[in-house]
Amino acid sequence: MSGLIVIPGKLPGVLLVQPKEFPDKRGFFTESYHAGKYSAAGIPQPFVQDNYSYSLKHVLRGLHTQVKQPQGKLVFVVQGEVFDVAVDIRRGSPTYGQWEGHVLSAANHHQLYVPAGFAHGFVVLSDSALVMYKCTALYNPGDEQGIAWNDPDIGIRWPVPHPVLGDKDAVLPRLRDLPDDRLPSLA
C-alpha cells in the first residue's frame, strides 16, 4: 500500500503500522490516519472516538479493556516514547493470555493497532509522553475492566521494573481471577 507499511504482529489482528514520512528542509509531513488506506490495510473501521493522554516518565497506564463493547485501538505517540502492549484476553482464543509489545515514539512514528477484545497498556520511557489513540467503540465506564500490569501468568517484560501507577491500576486483578462474564469473547 503506497505510503503505509503494515506489519502483522505475533498475535492475531495486532498490526504495527508505519506511515510514510516525507522529510524536507522544513521538517517532515506524514499522514497519521487515512480511512481508505487503513481500511484497505485491514484495520477495522470506523473509529468513533479519539483520546489522548499525557504522562510523565515511568507512568504505566493499563492494562485496560471493555467487556461487552470492546474497543479496537489505533495508538500512536505525538511526543516522547512508550513501550506499548497488547494482551489477548478473549475467552476461547488460542492465544489467550499472550502478549506483545512495541516501542512507539514521536521519532519513529510507528502506530499499533490493538484489536477489540484485547487489553492495552503502555509505560512511558521518555521524560514525558503524549499518546493518542483512535477507538472503534465509545468509552463506557460501566463496561471497563482491567488486568494487573504485573500478572505473573501473562509475564509481560516491561522495561521499567517499578512504574508509577494510578490508584485504579494499582489494584487490578490477575487475568485468572476474572470470571468469564468479565472477559471479552472471541468474536
For the regions a language model picked out, list residue spans one by one.
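Short alpha-helical functional segments enriched in proximate histidine and acidic residues
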Residues: G121
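Non-catalytic, conserved peripheral segments adjacent to functional cores
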Residues: M1-H110, S126-S128, C135-A187
